[in-house]
């Protein structure tokens, strides 16, 4: 590998939606940072088989639905 071209790879703490914490190595943030997940394998409908709504953080889903609500409708 070429030196000096790869991002820093360090240990971070990941906090899942239910509060479970674990440590992993990542290029995210800096050494010791915490990554708080909004959706994970314990809460995402694709893995739970549920039909629950995904939490709309920052209104992005709402803006998307509003913008494309009439798309492909006759």
From Swiss-Prot:
Transmembrane segments: none annotated. Signal peptide: none annotated. SUPFAM superfamilies: L28p-like. It holds the Pfam family Ribosomal_L31. Keywords: Ribonucleoprotein, Ribosomal protein, RNA-binding, rRNA-binding. One of its GO terms (cellular component) is ribonucleoprotein complex. GO terms for molecular function: rRNA binding; structural constituent of ribosome. Gene3D superfamilies: Ribosomal protein L31 (4.10.830.30). The keyword rRNA-binding applies. GO terms for biological process: translation. Belongs to the bacterial ribosomal protein bL31 family. Type A subfamily. Binds the 23S rRNA. PANTHER family: 50S RIBOSOMAL PROTEIN L31, CHLOROPLASTIC, LARGE RIBOSOMAL SUBUNIT PROTEIN BL31A. NCBIfam families: L31, PRK00528.1. Part of the 50S ribosomal subunit. HAMAP family: Ribosomal_bL31_1. This is Large ribosomal subunit protein bL31. It comes from Afipia carboxidovorans (strain ATCC 49405 / DSM 1227 / KCTC 32145 / OM5).
